[in-house]
């Protein structure tokens, strides 16, 4: 069975050129997510998409602390991709103060994604039910939930909507993850 990496931050690596080449050499299908439109733009400027590497336009909810969501920049980049990620909600203690800002940005992104039929890579820490609600309200049909850590009831509702989940080894090493 061929695995697909649906959540890889190429820009996190100092030796990103090496990883770009290695992914292509291994023929490993990979979705390279980004944390902001600026990072997405930089990745697209440095690297071309290949059969094995696609870039996703993102706005990580954790960015809301440092960098306001720029709708115009997001709208300018959206025609260049069918993939959106990393986007979502993070209501953990460190980011809960920006929950309203996160919701506003995520609603905007979900509305665009539904219209464009884009595939989303979604962050949902401590906000799983709200994330599900926003995806459904916007009519998003194509989403991959990244590193899910919520309850089983919400998990089943996400599955009922036809959403997918990205699973990694670290997730499976905890009791809750298993």
What are these regions (language model features)?
Residues 1-178:
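Mid-domain alpha/beta scaffold segments of enzyme catalytic cores
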């Amino acid at each position: 069975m061929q695995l697909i990496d649906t959540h890889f931050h190429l820009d996190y690596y100092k030796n990103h050129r090496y990883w770009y080449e290695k992914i292509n050499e291994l023929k490993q299908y990979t979705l390279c997510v980004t944390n902001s439109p600026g990072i997405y733009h930089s990745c697209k400027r440095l690297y071309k998409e290949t059969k094995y590497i696609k870039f996703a336009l993102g706005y990580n909810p954790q960015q809301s602390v440092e960098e306001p969501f720029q709708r115009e920049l997001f709208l300018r980049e959206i025609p260049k991709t069918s993939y959106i990620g990393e986007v979502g909600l993070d209501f953990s203690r460190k980011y809960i103060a920006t929950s309203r800002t996160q919701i506003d940005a995520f609603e905007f992104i979900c509305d665009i994604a539904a219209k464009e039929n884009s595939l989303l890579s979604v962050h949902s820490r401590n906000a799983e039910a709200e994330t599900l609600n926003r995806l459904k309200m916007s009519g998003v049909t194509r989403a991959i939930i990244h590193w899910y850590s919520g309850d089983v009831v919400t998990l089943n509702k996400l599955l009922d909507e036809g959403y997918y989940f990205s699973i990694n080894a670290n997730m499976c090493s905890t009791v809750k993850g298993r």
